[in-house]
Amino acid sequence: MTALPFKPAAPLGPVLVTGGSGFLGRALVRALVELGESVVVFDLRAPAPEARIAGAAYVEGDIRQQQDLHRVAADHGVASIVHLAALVIPACRANPVLGAEVNVIGHLNALDVARALGISRFVYTSSLAARPRGPLNSPANLYGVYKAACEDISKVHFLDHGLASIGLRPNVVYGPERVEGETAAISLAMRAAARGEAYEIPFTGAMCFQHVDEVVEIFLRCLAATPDRPVVSDLTTAIDSIDDVLAAIRAVRPEAQVSAAPIHRAAPEGIDNAPLRALLGSWQAVPLAEGARRTIEAFGA
């Protein structure tokens, strides 16, 4: 990560990050530690000691078990929660019941722990997959259904208990260390370019690509914000094509052997980050060309 462009005016922590061992979680935990915050990572399985972010505490627990989360938050005097723990699209498709337990019950558990302990800062990941689309005007997969439910649950939780949460809808977050998930192909293509290897992105089309540095800054700013009602927002309205991604890679590595399969993925429709802009104002965007450069250089280091 480059130098952090944002430093909160007041301490945010201790910050509890559920799912903090994943790609986005690691980047956020690293940034929080660099800011001097106290950070507790809650995951079903903590990473090996050598893979942990120095300065952060790691605790194992099951997001489906509210008592696990409550114990950790109470023991560490948590002041903010970033809820990232979730099963992604393939896992939800393979085991819908488990997907609902982790993604929906887990979300309810995190909200209830925040309520019980008087924690007022609560930021969580939703997804563009929550947006209705297609002939049925519904999310296209169960992961999106679960995320849409979490958005509505958060709004009702505010009506019942007054917790003004912030839900963020990323689309494709890329950067070094992103090697898992359907859209990790963007990062994997950049890794291949850095290593001089061939790689075919298994789809084409247009999407919202955001470098992890930009997304981390948005999360930090949201943690420092004080909304008076629940906020749900897309992160960006910028849409680029896979051809744009390939061009950005070749601008850094002209010899790169990267391509895309002719399997089209539809571009997201109706995206709107006005709620986020109204809450935060501006932040430091990372254009695709710059994000590709950072990612390729990091993979090549």
Predicted regions and their residues:
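NAD(P)H-binding glycine-rich loop region in Rossmannoid oxidoreductase-like domains
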Residues: 63-102
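Active-site segment of SDR-like NAD(P)-dependent oxidoreductases
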Residues: 87-89, 128-132, 171-174
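C-terminal substrate-binding subdomain of Rossmann-fold SDR/epimerase-dehydratase oxidoreductases
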Residues: 197, 202-301
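NAD(P)-dependent short-chain dehydrogenase/reductase
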Residues: 142, 155-207, 212-214
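Conserved glycine-rich Rossmann-like NAD(P)H-binding loop of the short-chain dehydrogenase/reductase
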Residues: 37-48
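Rossmann-fold cofactor-recognition segment
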Residues: 54-65
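N-terminal Rossmann NAD(P)H-binding glycine-rich loop of SDR-like oxidoreductase domains
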Residues: 14-35
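Conserved Rossmann-fold NAD(P)-dependent oxidoreductase catalytic core, especially the SDR/UDP-sugar
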Residues: 101, 105-144
